[in-house]
Amino acid sequence: MIDNCIANQASKEFSVSEISNKIKELLENNFGYIKVKGEISGLKRASSGHAYFNLKENTAILACTCWRPILAKIKFPLNDGMEVVIGGKLSSYSGNSRYQLSVDNLQPAGLGAMLQILNERKTRLEKEGLFNKKRIPIPFLPDKIGVITSITGAVIKDIIHRIRERFPTRIIIWQVSVQGENSGHEMAEAIEGFNNLEEIHKPSVIIVARGGGSIEDLWSFNDEILVRAAYNSKIPIISAVGHEADYTLIDLAADKRAPTPTAAAEFAVPVRSILNNTIQSYEKILFNNTNRLIKYHEQSIVNYDKIHSYFSYYINNRQQLLDEIGFNLLDVLIRFIALKETKIKSFSKERINYAKIINYKILELTHQTAYLFKSVNNTLKNFEYKLELNSTLLASLDYHNVLKRGFAIVKGDAGNFLSSKSAATNEQSLNIKFFDGEINVVLSCHDLNTRSN
């Protein structure tokens, strides 16, 4: 087409601007969107925000112009010597009679260049603290799980299958591209979208997943906007990118990293059967502990009976001792009075005028008698006080007083104590003890049905 155009214009005379415009037209019409791989050299940034550089390969050089809006979208710094792949359109610049490539898209080319960009970005984001946030714990039993991935691959099928196999839970899928120029933005918007849902629709945990691939395939998961979205998420995020050996920047910002998408599903939900076994084990432990507690209290009742018997015996002995002391004091008092009377009579028989002596002795006897009665009275009061204390203690330990307040002791066929309705269900008859006696009750089928209802 170019050859035909030149042949048709062979005899025509052009001005400088005409031939420049013609060349520009030929370039733009015959070369559409192209991709060129090369090494950046002579990079210059103008005050206007545009960037100018050459793309070279050996001795060949292609001038390139990167306008400010395009330059702002590039997420890594441009440097001389960096190998890149540039997409854009060819055009000519009439100011110096040269053609140039107008940049629409620029990506690093080669593993070395990509690793350099990755390390620089990782260092910068790490200094900002994006990888040192307080991790949000993954909920034990999430009611809803959000999954951000492509719906065309095997990843989503593996995740759904694994969750349904372990513990069926509602899954909300946010479809995104996991590879390509805008995939990082799509995944970041998905994270923000889940966080902005109403609480009733919001998932309890988010899984960001993709299958394995090369560093180029997984490059979107190193996108800065995606890393920041994961850092700012109020919902815990599980990253599951590639295989166990693959590592991306979102793994450092996520709340938990899974080596594979299937492992992410395992982190999100437990195994229902294992959970059921654990609950049954706890139920058995609770049942055994309850039985031990019942037996302990049954033994306590037996011990209280023994204590009651001991204190009854102790109080009876003290009462008997008190009675003996009372009898002895009375005998002593009678003998003392009789002795004094005998002395008085002997004085009268001898007709000796002992009036003063007798009066003195009578007064002395009166004082001694008063003292003796006071001493006996104090002793009796002391014993009565101790008896009252021991009786009060005995009454507090006597379970018969509890029965007088309306309680009863229920025993089964084997004489075992029954403390609950469910324990009485397996018994044929019951022995019920009240404070004033006990009765035996035979349970009928009607009683059992009524009790079950």
From Swiss-Prot:
Keywords: Cytoplasm, Exonuclease, Hydrolase, Nuclease. It holds the Pfam family tRNA_anti_2. Its EC number is 3.1.11.6. GO terms for biological process: DNA catabolic process. Its main location: cytoplasm. It catalyses: Exonucleolytic cleavage in either 5'- to 3'- or 3'- to 5'-direction to yield nucleoside 5'-phosphates. CDD domains: ExoVII_LU_OBF. It is found in: Cytoplasm. The keyword Protease does not apply. GO terms for cellular component: cytoplasm; exodeoxyribonuclease VII complex. GO terms for molecular function: exodeoxyribonuclease VII activity; nucleic acid binding. InterPro entries: Exonuc_VII_L, Exonuc_VII_lsu_C, OB-fold_nuc-bd_dom. NCBIfam families: xseA. Belongs to the XseA family. Bidirectionally degrades single-stranded DNA into large acid-insoluble oligonucleotides, which are then degraded further into small acid-soluble oligonucleotides. Heterooligomer composed of large and small subunits. This is Exodeoxyribonuclease 7 large subunit. It comes from Rickettsia prowazekii (strain Madrid E).
